[in-house]
Amino acid sequence: MAASIGPKSIPETITRQTKGGRKLKYTLTVIQQPERARACGSGAKSSADRRPVDPPPVVQLRIYDETDPRQEKEITFHYNANFFLFATLEVARNIAQGRVQTSAPQAPVLTGMPVSGMAYLDRPNEAGYFIFPDLSVRHEGQYKLSFNLYEETKEEKDTDIEPSNDSSMRQMSSAAAAAESSFDWRMELKSDQFTVYSAKKFPGLSESTDLSRTVAEQGCRVRIRRDVRMRRRDTKPGGDFGEKEDEYQQGRATSPPFDYNIQAARQRALSASVHEDPQQRRGSGEISPYHSPVVNTPFRTPSISPSTPNAPLPPGNQLGWIPNGPGYAAAPSIQPPHPPPPPPSSYPQSMPATHHNQGPSTQFRQQPPQGPPPAPIGYDERRSSYSQFRPPTNPSQQQSYESDYRRMSFGYQIPASSQGPQPIAPAVQNPAYNQQSMEPTYSRNPPAYSTSFQDSVALAPLRAAEQPLAMSPLASVTSISRGTQNSAPMPSHNYNKLERSGSYSQYAPIEAEAPKSTNKRSFNDVFSTPTESLSNGRRPSAIGIDIEENTRKQEQMIYRRANGNIQNKPAPGLN
């Protein structure tokens, strides 16, 4: 079944007589007319951005042998000769000459491949076909294509009887007349008029026709354009005309629809805020989000705020290293009078109530303090919370020197039988020294523990005085004072040596009441390592041995030089 063919032009027919006595008839027909084209211009990019004439012109040639008028025979496939068709471009409407004599206008330029050889195809019919798939026009306008047929005979019997004269040569076009004498011009055929559009007005290339597909299927190089969805094949380099995508459709391919999500993400990426929280974006006058942790500082704990909603913060407590204001030293003086301790008989029942039940201390804990309560902050939070419960005998004394001693005295120096109520039980309640649980309890009720702490302070000398009774009768007076120092609080995990030296200074009145020896010995003399065996109950710290050593040292005049050497000289008064 023959493929459908577009509108044909009027066939052009010629007849010639060969030397062999045969009469040949040539029939030339344009079976596919050009319709539109896009002007490619004459600039530097004209060759890169060029569109072919659409659809590609196809010319059919048939040759008949009319030697016998009663029997016409087609000999296209059996005739031994070479044919080619040369295409030229002509203006469809002639331009009238003006009055002013001007130079002849330059002819329209046809670019591409204007020459086509004959292809012997079986479809749509058995004939010879000339295909022009690569013809382009540089300027826009109305044009026609002129096709000139040339033949190269191979056998002597097929040449013309009469040689070509000057008259016949003048009838040929200028392009055909310039051909070599070996080629014989046979005929000229013109196509229908078509329009060349500018780049802005060009409607686009149409889909390939059935004739173009039929020709391409038989091996001819024709660009096949399918539907719009298969027009982008820029990833395939090179290729056949039937497989390569049309360049114009690649240029006319519509851009993807505008995606607002992609554009918004691109803008955020350019502003370096892709992962930034929108709330953290601020202007020049807004507060930086990095200043917000100042509000959530450790001294503003949630447990203090509900109990003291209207209590103002004491001055100087915003930072841990700023000392308290002058009003803090006078704060203990405005405390309410201490309530009298309950009777000793109620002590066993008040102790569990302090730990588990809401006793009187719990009710007093809910009341806001009368004066500006000191807020424990910074590194000395635990020590500051304990230091505010001691009745200030000397308000100018530093509170950091007495923190660890009072805390450890709760658990080591106060016997349970000699105490009245149990308001100091919360100190033993927290063996792990939980800071968050201890601070709110002590900071809300300083008067509840002030009286009980007076008892602990008053009982400290009794503890120190009872210890020498259990010691050896040979112990010296200095060992008694040393035992008193040993009963001091044991160092904790955050115990500081400077604080330990300051806490020992609180026992100065206790050491003054105890009898002292006239000969004060150094630490190395008392705790020296024994070099001889001890027998008969002798001790390194015996009084007799110490007196002999002191007497011997005074007689020998032993002293240490600045360089560390020990000098031994007799005393000057004993010589």
From Swiss-Prot:
Any one GO cellular component localisation term in the record: cytoplasm
Q: Where is this region: Disordered?
A: 36-56, 227-402, 513-549
Keywords on this record? Cytoplasm, Nucleus, Sporulation, Transcription, Transcription regulation
Kindly report the protein's main subcellular placement as a broad class: nucleus
Q: Where is the composition biased (Basic and acidic residues)?
A: 274-284
Gene disruption phenotype: Leads to light-independent conidiation, loss of sclerotial development and oxalic acid production, and reduced virulence on several host plants. Increases conidiation and melanin biosynthesis.
Q: Where is the composition biased (Pro residues)?
A: 334-346
Domain of life the protein comes from: Eukaryota
Q: Where is the composition biased (Polar residues)?
A: 294-308, 355-365, 385-402, 516-538
GO biological process terms held by the UniProt record: sporulation resulting in formation of a cellular spore
Q: Which residues form the Velvet domain?
A: 21-225
Q: Where in the cell is it found?
A: Nucleus; Cytoplasm
Q: Where is this region: PEST?
A: 465-509
Does the keyword field hold Protein biosynthesis?
no
Q: Domain remarks in the entry?
A: The C-terminal PEST domain is a region rich in proline, glutamic acid, serine and threonine residues that is required for the light-dependent regulation of development and secondary metabolism.
The record's function comment reads: Component of the velvet transcription factor complex that controls sexual/asexual developmental ratio in response to light, promoting sexual development in the darkness while stimulating asexual sporulation under illumination. The velvet complex hat acts as a global regulator for secondary metabolite gene expression. Controls the expression of the oxalic acid and melanin gene clusters. Also controls the expression of proteases and carbohydrate-active enzymes. Involved in the resistance to oxidative stress. Required for full virulence.
- Quaternary structure? Component of the heterotrimeric velvet complex composed of LAE1, VEL1 and VEL2; VEL1 acting as a bridging protein between LAE1 and VEL2.
Q: What is this protein called?
A: Developmental and secondary metabolism regulator VEL1
Q: Which organism is it from?
A: Botryotinia fuckeliana (strain B05.10)
